[in-house]
Amino acid sequence: MTALYIVLGIVGIVAVVFITIMLLFHHRKVKLTEADMWLVNEFRRCNVMVFGKKGSGKDVLFAHVIALRGEKHYSNIPYSDNTEVIDLCEINAGDNTFEDCINGDIEKFDPRFEECCDIYISDAGIYFPNTMDKKLDDLYPSLPVFMALSRHLYNNNVHTNCQALGRPWKKIREQADSYIQVLRTRNRGDHLLLSIVGYEQIDVNSERLTQVCKYTVRVPVWELQYDSRHFRNVFLNCELTPFEKMKELISGRS
């Protein structure tokens, strides 16, 4: 019996050492590629809107940027251990509207978010469809105020993704400063390759975009922690198994 305990102890120690080495390997500091540096700087600089066809890899790009930055953030879906999941109705400037700003009737409110913690909104076109612009204006008049003043209020940015640029609520679209199109995702086993194009507006009065860069982004599979079929669990009374979730991530479908 003593020999069995010794063997089990040795196996346990070996397992702990192996897991520790793997964690250190996965989270080791690596030199950022040009594409990664551009992404980190762009998301730190301004509000970014990511768009692309269904399954192109929009959430994969969000998850990769979040992993690169390694900072606390807020989102409507859990991308990583650093995500604080929020309801999107929490994105507001209290009960203050543009009318209150004009009339000087500002009502102070308690801070909801921490300083310098960005917000990532997945599938903005589902939550804020442009077909409901008028209703959204009436129901959430304070959200656009937050979007316009987020740098003043919390020194943060608000990033969104959607399938088509024109699909989200106009009040959200007009606050974007940078646009990234995800063309496709290719599976390479232990990593995914995302083809992206960066754009900016030609001028503030035009919705036409001009291309500024093109990159292929390498995304290690191990850094993807989110459920690529999140809305299945939101809407359907069933849940993917851990194996099915990992299979979806490795396939690069998001």
Where do the language-model regions lie?
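Feature marks short, highly hydrophobic, charge-poor N-terminal signal-anchor/signal peptide-like helices
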Residues: 1-10
